[in-house]
């Protein structure tokens, strides 16, 4: 029993001795742990290792928020901190040690690296001692000693501008008026001025008051309220006549031709927080603009340029790191703004699209969609009335139509003829015997038949089939080829593949699945069925008829050479192209032709009309119609126009389109 008591006392004394002599972490161990936390940017944990004096100077919350924000704003990546050994001069110093360390990191402004020295102090708490870091801001950047601060600034590049073929600006950077208030100059007329100015600028009084109540605003501050378009000088004059209201000039994106080029140029707006998160760090800042639609979006990377960054000490101007901004590149288009405006003026009151090409080179002279919108509204703001009207419009003015697909109607007939000629199943001068207005292949079609407009002609060759737009002739042409041959031929014209173009174009399709029945094959041969084409593709598909049978590759970006790039070679023979042009001349110049009226003197146009009936069945009385006309100047060979207008039922069908399209050749 006595032995047990002695042993117990010995163990207790030993345990007390161990506790009393517990080893304090060495300065090197403390620094190593701190460096690990630093490399992981664990500022919460780092704070625990700071000296008492540092903790008196800055709270944990402020420490974490400040240094976390600096690293985030600087875009710090690949942070690497390494510590050395305790300075030899400190060997005999029991309460203070100096340890050198190296820091390297990648930032938005470039690589930063430096050497510094950490001071560690031995401090006592209630029951223990520990080595703590005597932190100061120079740990983050060496230049931040002596109460200096750091500034991280993004430098926006100049956005590239968009020009037409003749150097006319379609999307430009320019100085525009910005209207604002100097609060101290309002005097006793503050309420009256705010009320009047709100009406003139289409703002609410609350909008203005909130801006005037911002924390930074002083009596002599200029408080910006609204940018206005350069052509609104009258508004600027009226607004600045009010007491305390003045203007300044600011750089802004501007679209000089507004709604006429809206779907082509698209627009930019301020980047959202959500969009910023998805972008590569450092490529955009929270003050950046971003292309949202049209070419502004398609060529965002080229137009945008590269954001510059600067990390510096504002008190001294000393630069810690800097990356210069790289301005965006300009876009020079093949678009001719005069042609663009003429086409838009014809379409602006309708819903539709138009494309103009130089058919020998494939250069796009115009891309028009209607109804449209003014892209400047996204820069300078919309009135509530304008915004509501645009969003309620069932014809969707924000969506381009020249790159969407629609049933082409009878405009497909020349293409179908070309495929037949190429494959030897159709001879231009060979006459088909067609009797009556209706026809079906055999009794397997049941009650279904193909109908033509007139039964006058019973012996029909290609020229007359095109002039009279004979559905039966072209249905038989498709059946003579067969589904496989017709499908292969359509693919040589670019169906079922992406159009090689500098603007996104919806892929044209032959059928929902395939031409799996004779009825569908026949209907497709004259432009009904399930076929879908974009106006841009349809215009391109007529280029083989203008010259030598090659399908020209369309282009939107201006290049040094004006020679054409070929998309598909010899989709029709040169002789076949001439035969088709002969028939298409008759469509316009023969009084039997669907594009004969109205007669326009002085033009030499070959073309084809088309009316696509959008019905659920033949008996559908409420179906709508899209009217088409595709035509080209067969003498000068310098202009090809494809135009589509929706809802032409009760307006003359495709004849409504012909009149508008012919004007383009008259004025060219």
Swiss-Prot record:
<keyword id="KW-0133">Cell shape</keyword>
<dbReference type="Pfam" id="PF00905">
    <property type="entry name" value="Transpeptidase"/>
</dbReference>
<feature type="active site" description="Acyl-ester intermediate">
    <location>
        <position position="410"/>
    </location>
</feature>
<protein>
    <recommendedName>
        <fullName>Penicillin-binding protein 3</fullName>
        <ecNumber>3.4.16.4</ecNumber>
    </recommendedName>
</protein>
<feature type="transmembrane region" description="Helical">
    <location>
        <begin position="7"/>
        <end position="23"/>
    </location>
</feature>
<dbReference type="GO" id="GO:0045121">
    <property type="term" value="C:membrane raft"/>
</dbReference>
<dbReference type="GO" id="GO:0071555">
    <property type="term" value="P:cell wall organization"/>
</dbReference>
<dbReference type="InterPro" id="IPR050515">
    <property type="entry name" value="Bact_Transpept/Beta-Lactamase"/>
</dbReference>
<dbReference type="InterPro" id="IPR007887">
    <property type="entry name" value="MecA_N"/>
</dbReference>
<dbReference type="GO" id="GO:0009252">
    <property type="term" value="P:peptidoglycan biosynthetic process"/>
</dbReference>
<keyword id="KW-0472">Membrane</keyword>
<comment type="similarity">
    <text>Belongs to the transpeptidase family.</text>
</comment>
<dbReference type="Pfam" id="PF05223">
    <property type="entry name" value="MecA_N"/>
</dbReference>
<dbReference type="GO" id="GO:0008360">
    <property type="term" value="P:regulation of cell shape"/>
</dbReference>
<dbReference type="InterPro" id="IPR005311">
    <property type="entry name" value="PBP_dimer"/>
</dbReference>
<keyword id="KW-0645">Protease</keyword>
<keyword id="KW-1003">Cell membrane</keyword>
<comment type="function">
    <text>Penicillin-binding proteins (PBPs) function in the late steps of murein biosynthesis. Probably required for both cortical and vegetative peptidoglycan synthesis. Although not usually required for cell division, in the absence of PBP 2B (pbpB) it becomes essential. Confers resistance to oxacillin and cephalexin.</text>
</comment>
<keyword id="KW-0378">Hydrolase</keyword>
<keyword id="KW-0121">Carboxypeptidase</keyword>
<comment type="pathway">
    <text>Cell wall biogenesis; peptidoglycan biosynthesis.</text>
</comment>
<dbReference type="GO" id="GO:0046677">
    <property type="term" value="P:response to antibiotic"/>
</dbReference>
<keyword id="KW-0046">Antibiotic resistance</keyword>
<dbReference type="InterPro" id="IPR036138">
    <property type="entry name" value="PBP_dimer_sf"/>
</dbReference>
<keyword id="KW-0961">Cell wall biogenesis/degradation</keyword>
<dbReference type="GO" id="GO:0009002">
    <property type="term" value="F:serine-type D-Ala-D-Ala carboxypeptidase activity"/>
</dbReference>
<dbReference type="GO" id="GO:0008658">
    <property type="term" value="F:penicillin binding"/>
</dbReference>
<dbReference type="GO" id="GO:0006508">
    <property type="term" value="P:proteolysis"/>
</dbReference>
<dbReference type="InterPro" id="IPR012338">
    <property type="entry name" value="Beta-lactam/transpept-like"/>
</dbReference>
<keyword id="KW-0812">Transmembrane</keyword>
<dbReference type="InterPro" id="IPR001460">
    <property type="entry name" value="PCN-bd_Tpept"/>
</dbReference>
<dbReference type="Pfam" id="PF03717">
    <property type="entry name" value="PBP_dimer"/>
</dbReference>
<keyword id="KW-1133">Transmembrane helix</keyword>
<dbReference type="GO" id="GO:0071972">
    <property type="term" value="F:peptidoglycan L,D-transpeptidase activity"/>
</dbReference>
<keyword id="KW-0573">Peptidoglycan synthesis</keyword>
<dbReference type="GO" id="GO:0005886">
    <property type="term" value="C:plasma membrane"/>
</dbReference>
<dbReference type="InterPro" id="IPR032710">
    <property type="entry name" value="NTF2-like_dom_sf"/>
</dbReference>
